[in-house]
A protein has these predicted regions:
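Extreme N-terminal starter segment of soluble prokaryotic enzymes
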Residues: 1-3
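A short linear hydrophobic-aromatic micro-motif
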Residues: 29-31, 55-57, 93-97
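Glycine-rich acetyl-CoA-binding "A-motif" of GNAT/NAT acetyltransferases
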Residues: 119
Length: 129
């Protein structure tokens, strides 16, 4: 089981604003922000649900290659809301909401590229309600 994931971004404030909007439909919000004065490192923002930060961004510089992160959605409507919110926040389409039957018959997901080109996915693994 993964406890949390973190990765550097090229523009901390831009990425923080993007994820605050894009992850809200999935029940995520900014849980904690750690500033440089506290650690001696670049600032970091921890997003999560139910008060537990499990999705971290930080630093300045970004990565040489994009990451793929999939976040579980509560239902298909949440996948669609994530996609709309992420696009409105400046994300780029990398796969509109829909069934991805090549994974399994009920794999309903949407993919958005964040401002640094990371492939962020919201996925629901259940049948249509």
């Amino acid at each position: 089981m993964i406890d949390h994931i973190g990765f550097p971004v090229s523009d901390y404030e831009r990425a923080k604003a993007f994820y605050a909007k894009a992850l809200a439909p999935l029940g995520y919000s900014l849980v904690i922000e750690v500033m440089q004065q506290q650690t001696g490192h670049n600032p970091a923002a921890g997003f999560g649900a139910n008060g537990k930060p499990d999705f971290w961004i930080g630093g300045e510089g970004g990565l040489n290659k994009p990451l793929h992160v999939a976040i579980v959605a509560m239902d298909r409507a949440s996948v669609e809301a994530f996609y709309k919110a992420a696009m409105a926040a400046g994300g780029r389409d990398n796969g509109a909401p829909g069934i991805r039957a090549h994974y399994h018959p009920d794999y309903y997901a949407a993919f958005v590229l964040d401002p640094d080109g990371h492939n962020i996915e919201a996925v629901f693994h259940g049948p249509r309600a």
